[in-house]
UniProtKB/Swiss-Prot annotation:
Name under which the protein is recorded: Uncharacterized response regulatory protein VPA0021
Keywords: DNA-binding, Phosphoprotein, Transcription, Transcription regulation, Two-component regulatory system
Annotated ranges, domain Response regulatory: 6-121
SUPFAM superfamilies: CheY-like
Organism: Vibrio parahaemolyticus serotype O3:K6 (strain RIMD 2210633)
Length: 263
């Protein structure tokens, strides 16, 4: 078997570049990562110079995004196999899964990466097939449809800090967000049910637009809760409403009380 394959990693998140590089070294130690870059233009230059067999491309990158880069690569005589690194939901991914070399959904699990490597190896063994450009064009057309503005893509994970450490938190683990003066606190349930507090620099106003409104409700100007994590709702004698997330009691503004009608 030919083990001399090469690849590049393009992602604007240093933590994700490092994580993918480290994970690839474990599941495919023979693969040579010839470049790790932060945007599409750097990736294009690295690909033209090193002509790798595989390109791991984040779809959302500054300067030149992954999809635009793929269109440019498709004009090359021998384009690399592309593995898109994406935050798309599973239902959207299935629409183009058969045409892509593969995709990786953030945050990337080792088991999923192992499957990706096996699929890529199989595709590499069939290199030179006449329909490679046709498959790439079909993939790009479907990606353009999936990334159209009318199809909202909500956050699946959040990068947050805890002290000097950076963490990737699945939004499904988040209990609630609480705005402070210069940052937003993220309270998430980790491990054996222990609640951990993390910090993010994104404003609550910006964050709420990136969250699924069916899963997260802004109950107050300073707090957003995950609906499925609410244990109870009550009012005091003065008519003030509160929601409980575990043992935490959060106020509900009068404007937001209508969210709980019928509950």
């Amino acid at each position: 078997m030919n083990t001399g394959f090469t690849a590049i990693i393009a992602d604007d998140e240093p933590l994700l570049r490092h994580h993918l590089d480290k994970s690839l070294a474990e599941v495919w130690p023979e693969l040579d990562i010839v470049a790790k870059v932060a945007d599409g233009e750097q990736a294009l230059l690295a690909i033209e110079q090193s002509q790798p067999d595989i390109a791991f491309l984040d779809i959302r990158m500054p300067v030149l995004d992954g999809m635009s880069l793929a269109q440019k690569l498709n004009r090359l005589a021998n384009p690399p196999l592309i593995v898109f690194v994406t935050a798309y939901d599973d239902y959207a991914i299935k629409a183009f899964e058969q045409n892509a070399a593969d995709y990786l959904l953030k945050p990337i699990s080792d088991a999923r990466l192992q499957t990706t490597c096996e699929r890529v190896k199989a595709r590499l063994s069939q290199r030179g097939s006449d329909n490679s450009h046709v498959q790439m064009n079909s993939l790009l057309e479907q990606l353009q449809q999936l990334s159209a503005p009318q199809t909202p893509q909500y956050l699946q994970w959040i990068k947050a800090t805890q002290g000097d450490d950076i963490h990737l938190i699945a939004t499904s683990d988040v209990l609630y967000f609480k705005a402070e003066e210069k940052y937003v606190s993220v309270y998430a349930q980790q491990g054996k049910g222990e609640v951990q507090e993390y910090l993010i620099r994104t404003s609550l106003k910006e964050l709420i637009g990136q969250l699924n409104p069916e899963q997260f409700w802004q109950v107050h100007r300073s707090s957003v809760v995950q609906v499925s994590k609410i244990s109870k709702v009550n009012k005091d004698f003065a008519g003030r409403m509160f929601v409980y997330v575990g043992e935490t009691k959060l106020p509900v503004s009068r404007a937001s009380q209508s969210l709980f009608k019928g509950m």
